A protein has these predicted regions:
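Glycine-rich phosphate-binding loops at beta-strand->alpha-helix junctions
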Residues: 57-63
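Residue-level detector of conserved, well-ordered beta-strand and adjacent loop positions
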Residues: 9-10, 56, 87
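Acyl-thioester C-C bond-transforming condensing/cleaving domain
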Residues: 1-6, 18-47, 64-65, 72-145
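Short glycine-rich phosphate-binding loop at a beta-alpha junction
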Residues: 49-56, 113
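Short polar catalytic/cofactor-binding loops
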Residues: 11-16
Length: 145
């Protein structure tokens, strides 16, 4: 049984920032959107021609739900196209590409944008008891990174 060939074409990456540097206020989903827009521009592929978007993102706290979907929509992908967020520490972007290839091999998709989006500068501090208010005694703050 043969499977469709999965080909990586027109790869794009954003700049690599330094901690507390120029990208410290840029949300991960916007970095992902920039990469998606540029990949589509370079390839000449219309966003409507995509079947799926797969993006890796590890520190999802503060990014709201499904960062891949947010990046896809901000990147110009129509809202009727599905998006999957992959979370595999230190390998989410690579896993996103592998998962996109699997979608193609299984015949679920023909054109998929895959990659990763992360900004560790925006990893929030978490206060588990803050939603309902702290009372007497010490509270605790956790670093999401």
């Amino acid at each position: 049984m043969s499977r469709p060939e999965a080909v990586i074409c027109h790869p794009v990456r954003t700049a690599i920032g330094t901690y507390n540097g120029a990208l410290k206020t840029t949300p991960a989903v916007e970095l992902g959107a920039v990469a998606i827009r540029e990949c589509l521009r370079r390839s000449g592929l219309a966003p409507e021609a995509l079947d799926s978007v797969v993006m890796g993102n590890v520190i999802q706290a503060g990014n709201k739900m499904n960062p891949a979907r947010q990046a896809a929509i901000h990147g110009g992908v129509p809202v009727d196209k599905p998006a999957l967020t992959v979370n595999r520490v230190c390998g989410s972007g690579a896993q996103a590409v592998a998962s996109a290839a699997m979608e193609i091999w299984l015949g679920l998709a023909h054109a998929v944008v895959a990659g990763g989006c992360e900004n560790m500068d925006l990893a929030p501090y978490l206060m588990p008891g803050a939603r309902w208010g702290y009372r007497m005694g010490d509270g605790q703050i956790y670093d999401a990174m």
